[in-house]
């Protein structure tokens, strides 16, 4: 990996010469000949320089301003040995939180911390403890900006392309090049000249010294153009000034470090240096040109022209693009350096500018602003989002005023609402937001679960504001809001709570009204804000990773699953806000409610083309929208956003249950919203049951959270598990369109018992196994889900979505989905146990504890084989006749594909075994195995074993195989350590048939950008089996092992990859930015709770 800025590709030019999109990377060119210096001179110079050049390994712990969270490498060099000062680029030092180490040529590695990053120009300083370098003799590299001249032969000494030490040759060709333009929405230097040479630098050489034959640094390498061999170097005049301030600040310290202050002034405007020929075309008068040429140094070829002005800045309303600068305070000025001297030394003073605008001379007075006052030094972290005042850099890019509430990373809460990165927040809960303090004040009035409107602007569509609904996290997915402030004396960003718990107000209900305290679900709504994770995942985007390579999880899996979300992410969500009116609230309005309700029902019933089945089932249809927090991307879930149609199967005054496929609700750690077809209302739901085998989940909602009008019109569908569908039967496929309109068609069952065979994904996730599904002759496509009903609207099957991964090659794959019918017999059995009381642990549902069912399963993956094929594998004619008599339709036998690792069947059954009978009863389908397991629970004795008759390599065997009981909770505990998310191996991982020999270990399911796990390569898809020699067979052992680790300690980790390859790596724990915490589902409160396991005191 390389420096992020150095890996940017060049882009098309916006103008003919000056505004080109260059790429920050480092280049290699053959050395030029005819050098004025001898080879011995260069050897001596390089002998001094190379030991003073260091490789910088930086980790941006949070997204901030123009930078994203991540790890990179670059170059720096020692400019003050006694004080321990390293010079490098600003985009290496980073404007936000950063952790860095410097490695010398002798492989000594020392910690360094940032002390200054220039707000505009591409340079910054790290500091280190000189006494930490024990085994290397080195000298500082002197800075000589005056030595730079056209034709000077130079060497660039740096970490080119990660090669530790590289020496690239070149010749300075220009000293007055325009500052390179890297990105429209990222960091760019301006108001300075750059130097140019054909030295061919690439990624990793940012911050390298550009030296002459005497070993002096004449410039600082900053970037390059990827389409050519041109490298761009920053002049050092302003670097020398900043260094002198930094040295004086260090010398003035007593016993306690203090932050350095380097005066910097600004007018919040950008100048370009244009030639006299172009300035004449702008209307420059001839007499003015004569005066300027006469007063300027010999060889001056142009003047400074205003390129852009930041709104609400000191120059706004005074200067305009195209204005030509003639004099400042009565002196002719044509160079950036002279202007910057006046600005930096005149903070708070008034400058008199003489300009020409279209040939008309004008004079303006402008106040010089402190540049540091518009450079953000703090940010708010809430629900994984990073929000801070809009910086001068981005204000210049986007043409917004400085200081607005800027989204550097949307995290989870804002991403869920559709707020993008780089957005400007204008309103929250109908209150204006003009600064970060306003946002904190509004958030302090909101509580968990509150849904409020948010208004934002984007630079890509700056003339229109967008409104969305933001939901404050109901569960403790992340830490409470934290306010981070930069501390230049320590190099760290210090965190403190942004909101005091006492300031949290009562919860707001789903309809926008306070929930009364007598409603059973309110036990969690009235609690103060709890912790909600220190860092989101970027990536989403943030996004976080689930593969062992780059681990990108930005792809949302199925295109169909995300299509509606992409198209409706703003306007659709905003429209939902209008559904929460007050007209259906009070008892006094019941008569009006009934009238409105009657009209709504009439409109539905009078639908011209609606079938009887469609009208009967429509009150039971519900649309699910599901969001998965990046901090809880468990069990290999392949997206953060899902939607699909579900069916209400139970509805009473105190509990409602809806069923939906597991490609919509994949894991229990999710935020679920339900929109009902029967009435325009949207309420949250909670995952209460995930079937361990079958592709369905049960979601509970609280009918008392609705008003009586909406609750009364909703109906539960009638399930009809018997008789089973047969080939040729007519059914109605009913579901919801994107606008929540019921849609149906009549179809014919072509195969009522099609066996599924879904392969494993690259990143193991749930896949339906041991299931028979229903196939139809026609449907509505792979993105339409719903139900199969008879003519009366009774549910015969769920028409659900299944996730699969299509692999085109060993390195290329794509997520897809398909839809099939899921018989309702298994659903009806679980539903009955939930209503009457199951045999498992209790779960709090809408304030009432209900015993949940346990499901007994044989943890073996099976697949059917035709009897004609089975005969070739040694199946006898007698058994063939028995199986045909048992099931003349299927004419198949079940074979073992594999056993789940850690199951009771492991080491008993082998791949390829044919299962002929269970308890002496022939079996031909998955239902036979499932029925045998259920029979064990009905017996009067507690027998957990099945007597299997199998055929193995032509030999008939009798085996006693144990079964396993599983609940429907899914994964309920996860630990975040050093930015990697670990959990117990989930069934999809165990289905691979492998667990480490060193004990099962804890499974790394994902990692976070900018974390120690990212920095040291502790990626996903592997088990951690040892921490500092201590075995970690489960999460309890892992938690105990990590609690003993201290901040800054190097930790030795032993891992085993999914392919069985062991590995040992080390990483450095960082408890300041990445404390160790766990997230655990609490069945007593039905909440996900976040607990800190280890953090700095």
From Swiss-Prot:
Skewed-composition ranges (Polar residues): 546-556
The enzyme's E.C. designation: 3.4.21.-
GO terms, molecular function: peptidase activity; serine-type endopeptidase activity
Biological processes annotated in GO: photoinhibition; proteolysis
One Gene Ontology cellular component annotation held by this UniProt entry: chloroplast
Broad class of enzyme this protein falls into: hydrolase
Compartments in which it is found: Cytoplasm
Family of this protein: Belongs to the peptidase S1C family.
Protein name: Protease Do-like 7
């Amino acid at each position: 990996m390389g420096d992020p800025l150095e890996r940017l590709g060049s882009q098309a030019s916006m103008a003919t010469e000056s505004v080109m999109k260059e790429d920050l990377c480092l280049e290699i060119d053959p050395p030029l000949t005819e050098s004025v210096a001898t080879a011995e001179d260069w050897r001596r110079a390089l002998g001094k320089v190379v030991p003073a050049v260091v490789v910088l390994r930086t980790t941006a712990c949070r997204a901030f301003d123009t930078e994203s969270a991540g790890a990179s490498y670059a170059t720096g060099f020692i400019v003050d040995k006694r004080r321990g000062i390293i010079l490098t680029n600003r985009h290496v030092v980073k404007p936000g939180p950063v952790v860095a180490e410097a490695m010398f040529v002798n492989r000594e590695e020392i910690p360094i911390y940032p002390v200054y990053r220039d707000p505009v120009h591409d340079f910054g300083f790290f500091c280190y403890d000189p006494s930490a370098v024990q085994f290397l003799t080195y000298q500082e590299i002197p800075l000589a900006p005056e030595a730079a001249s056209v034709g000077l032969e130079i060497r660039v000494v740096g970490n080119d392309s990660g090669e530790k030490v590289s020496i690239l040759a070149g010749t300075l060709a220009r000293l007055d090049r325009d500052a390179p333009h890297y990105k429209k929405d990222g960091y760019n230097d301006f108001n300075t000249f750059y130097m140019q040479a054909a030295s061919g630098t690439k990624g990793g050489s940012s911050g390298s010294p550009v030296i002459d034959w005497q070993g002096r640094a004449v410039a600082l390498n900053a970037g390059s153009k990827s389409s050519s061999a041109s490298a761009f170097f920053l002049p050092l005049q302003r670097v020398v000034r900043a260094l002198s301030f930094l040295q004086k600040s260090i010398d003035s310290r007593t016993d306690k470090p203090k932050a350095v202050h380097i005066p910097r002034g600004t007018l919040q405007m950008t100048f370009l240096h244009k030639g006299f020929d172009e300035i004449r075309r702008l209307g420059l008068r001839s007499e003015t040109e004569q005066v300027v040429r006469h007063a300027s140094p010999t060889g001056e070829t142009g003047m400074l022209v205003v390129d852009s002005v930041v709104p609400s800045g000191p120059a706004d309303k005074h200067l305009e693009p195209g204005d030509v600068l003639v004099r400042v305070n009565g002196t002719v000025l044509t160079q950036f350096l002279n202007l910057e001297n006046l600005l930096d030394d005149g903070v708070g003073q008034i400058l008199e500018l003489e300009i020409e605008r279209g040939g008309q001379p004008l004079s303006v007075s402008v106040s010089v602003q402190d540049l540091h006052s518009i450079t953000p030094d703090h940010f708010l972290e809430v629900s994984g989002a990073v929000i801070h005042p809009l910086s001068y850099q981005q204000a210049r890019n986007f043409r917004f005023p400085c200081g607005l509430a800027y989204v550097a990373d949307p995290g989870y809460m804002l991403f869920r609402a559709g707020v993008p990165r780089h957005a400007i927040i204008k309103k929250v809960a109908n209150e204006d937001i003009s600064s970060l303090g306003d946002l904190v004040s509004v958030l302090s009035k909101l509580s968990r679960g509150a849904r409020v409107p948010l208004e934002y602007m984007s630079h890509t569509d700056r003339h229109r504001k967008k409104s969305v609904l933001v939901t404050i996290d109901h569960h403790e997915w992340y830490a409470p809001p934290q306010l981070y402030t930069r501390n230049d004396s320590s190099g760290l960003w210090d965190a403190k709570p942004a909101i005091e718990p006492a300031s949290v107000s009562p919860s707001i209900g789903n309809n926008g009204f306070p929930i009364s305290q007598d409603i059973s679900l309110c036990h969690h709504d009235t609690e103060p804000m709890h912790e909600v994770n220190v860092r989101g995942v970027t990536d989403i985007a943030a996004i976080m990773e689930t593969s062992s390579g780059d681990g990108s999880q930005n792809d949302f899996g199925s295109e169909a699953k995300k299509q509606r979300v992409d198209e409706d992410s703003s306007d659709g969500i905003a429209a939902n806000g209008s559904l929460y009116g007050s007209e259906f609230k009070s008892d006094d309005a019941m008569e009006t409610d009934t009238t409105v309700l009657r009209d709504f029902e009439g409109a539905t019933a009078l639908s011209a083309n609606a079938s009887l089945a469609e009208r009967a089932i429509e009150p039971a249809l519900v649309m699910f929208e599901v969001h998965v927090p990046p901090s809880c991307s468990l069990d290999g879930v392949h997206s953060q956003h899902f939607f699909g149609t579900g069916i209400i199967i139970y509805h009473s005054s105190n509990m409602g249950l809806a069923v939906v496929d597991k490609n919509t609700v994949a894991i229990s750690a999710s935020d679920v919203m339900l929109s009902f077809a029967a009435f325009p209302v949207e309420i949250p739901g909670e995952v209460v049951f995930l079937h361990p085998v079958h592709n369905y989940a049960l979601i509970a909602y609280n009918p008392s959270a609705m008003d009586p009008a909406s609750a009364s019109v909703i109906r539960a569908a009638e399930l009809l598990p018997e008789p089973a569908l047969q080939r040729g039967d007519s059914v109605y496929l009913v579901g919801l369109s994107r606008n929540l309109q019921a849609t149906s068609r009549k179809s014919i069952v072509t195969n009522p018992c099609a066996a599924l065979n879904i392969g494993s994904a690259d990143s193991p996730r749930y896949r339906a196994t041991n299931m028979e599904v229903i196939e139809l002759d026609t449907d509505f496509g792979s993105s339409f889900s719903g139900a199969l009903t008879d003519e009366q609207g009774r549910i015969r099957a769920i028409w659900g979505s299944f996730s699969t991964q299509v692999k085109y090659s060993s390195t290329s794959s794509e997520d897809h989905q398909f839809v099939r019918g899921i018989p309702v017999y298994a659903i009806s059995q679980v539903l009955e146990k939930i209503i009457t009381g199951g045999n498992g642990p209790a779960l709090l549902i809408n304030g009432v504890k209900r015993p949940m069912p346990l499901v007994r399963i044989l943890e073996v993956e099976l697949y059917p084989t035709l009897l004609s094929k089975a005969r070739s594998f040694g199946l006898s004619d007698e058994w063939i006749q028995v199986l045909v008599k048992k099931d003349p339709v299927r004419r198949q036998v079940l074979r073992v594909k594999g056993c789940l690792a850690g199951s009771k069947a492991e080491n008993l059954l082998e791949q390829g075994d044919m299962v002929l009978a269970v308890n002496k009863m022939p079996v031909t389908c998955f239902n036979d195995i499932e029925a045998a397991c259920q029979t064990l629970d009905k017996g009067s004795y507690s027998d957990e074993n099945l007597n299997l008759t199998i055929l193995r390599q032509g030999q008939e065997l009798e085996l006693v195989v144990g079964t396993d009981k599983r609940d429907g909770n899914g994964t309920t505990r996860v630990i975040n350590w050093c930015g990697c998310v670990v959990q117990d191996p989930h069934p999809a991982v165990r289905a691979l048939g492998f667990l480490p020999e060193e004990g099962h270990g804890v499974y790394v399911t994902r990692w976070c950008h900018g974390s120690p796990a990212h920095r040291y390569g502790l990626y996903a898809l592997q088990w951690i089996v040892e921490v500092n020699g201590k075995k970690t067979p489960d999460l309890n052992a892992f938690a105990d092992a990590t609690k003993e680790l201290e901040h800054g300690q190097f930790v030795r980790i032993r891992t085993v990859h999914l392919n069985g390859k062991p590995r040992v790596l080390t990483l450095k724990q960082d408890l300041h930015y990445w404390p160790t915490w766990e997230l655990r589902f609490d069945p007593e409160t039905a909440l996900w709770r976040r607990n800190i396991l280890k953090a700095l005191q």
